[in-house]
Amino acid sequence: MHAYLHCLSHSPLVGYVDPAQEVLDEVNGVIASARERIAAFSPELVVLFAPDHYNGFFYDVMPPFCLGVGATAIGDFGSAAGELPVPVELAEACAHAVMKSGIDLAVSYCMQVDHGFAQPLEFLLGGLDKVPVLPVFINGVATPLPGFQRTRMLGEAIGRFTSTLNKRVLFLGAGGLSHQPPVPELAKADAHMRDRLLGSGKDLPATERELRQQRVISAAEKFVEDQRTLHPLNPIWDNQFMTLLEQGRIQELDAVSNEELSAIAGKSTHEIKTWVAAFAAISAFGNWRSEGRYYRPIPEWIAGFGSLSARTEN
């Protein structure tokens, strides 16, 4: 069967701190075109690789990878809330297959996800519940982080499993590209924030969640005025990364350490490993070609914003 892929940056700042209307129209047009291509493909199953931002995963237990056998989106920053339509038996079979391939994949029957999962489903499929989905969390902010090599191997294992299903499979990678918004770090946290990072942040009071969101919005507004206030975006790195993906050279990223990536492009750039997993997965279906490449640095969203599709040729 055929597979399709789309990787897309996300930002909680969409609708809160937006770029000029012409830029917004351009991005919306790119997303609309991707949505049309996906609709024409008519996926029967979605595999969504996405990160978390201390909304569902915490330091009480922080896996490098986790497959949601059941998952619920919390609706942060105005994103869609509700249950994701996970096919339980298929998710369980996927977990077993990945484990047998040598990848230690955690599973959760009550995975809590945020805008990192919700936005791509909203933007590209029109909602959380449109197509059965296997949601795969990849840790992109909480050290110690998985590296490129292990993430690639995860994608390959999931790709091999889904290639046996006789279904039209859509792989989505969500996050990146270069960026470093104000995300708390355990090593620098005060007592209150440390408690939140250790797990109490899973059920934040509404007032505290609003304050947290406002801090991100304020940081974006300052970044627009002075891009020295946060780690700068890195369009050169972002475009080099997208070229590696397009050329099927993702294995070259194995040599890039987590420390090097953080220094080059920002500490939240590790979200791009969702793109690596997606491209590794589609490779299990045979030859593919990329299409629909788009990139623009958008300071208002504190992100090097990218969009890239691929389709199998067999």
Curated annotation (Swiss-Prot):
Organism: Escherichia coli O81 (strain ED1a)
InterPro entries (UniProt xref): DHPP/DHXA_dioxygenase, Xdiol_dOase_suB
Active site per database record: 115, 179
Pfam families: LigB (PF02900)
Subunit structure: Homotetramer.
Family: Belongs to the LigB/MhpB extradiol dioxygenase family.
One BP term from GO: 3-phenylpropionate catabolic process
Pathway annotation: Aromatic compound metabolism; 3-phenylpropanoate degradation
UniProtKB keywords: Aromatic hydrocarbons catabolism, Dioxygenase, Iron, Oxidoreductase
UniProt EC number: 1.13.11.16
GO molecular function per UniProt: 3-carboxyethylcatechol 2,3-dioxygenase activity; ferrous iron binding
Substrates-to-products reaction catalysed: 3-(2,3-dihydroxyphenyl)propanoate + O2 = (2Z,4E)-2-hydroxy-6-oxonona-2,4-dienedioate + H(+); (2E)-3-(2,3-dihydroxyphenyl)prop-2-enoate + O2 = (2Z,4E,7E)-2-hydroxy-6-oxonona-2,4,7-trienedioate + H(+)
Record's function text: Catalyzes the non-heme iron(II)-dependent oxidative cleavage of 2,3-dihydroxyphenylpropionic acid and 2,3-dihydroxicinnamic acid into 2-hydroxy-6-ketononadienedioate and 2-hydroxy-6-ketononatrienedioate, respectively.
The protein's name: 2,3-dihydroxyphenylpropionate/2,3-dihydroxicinnamic acid 1,2-dioxygenase
Top-level class of the enzyme under EC nomenclature: oxidoreductase
Cofactor: Fe(2+)
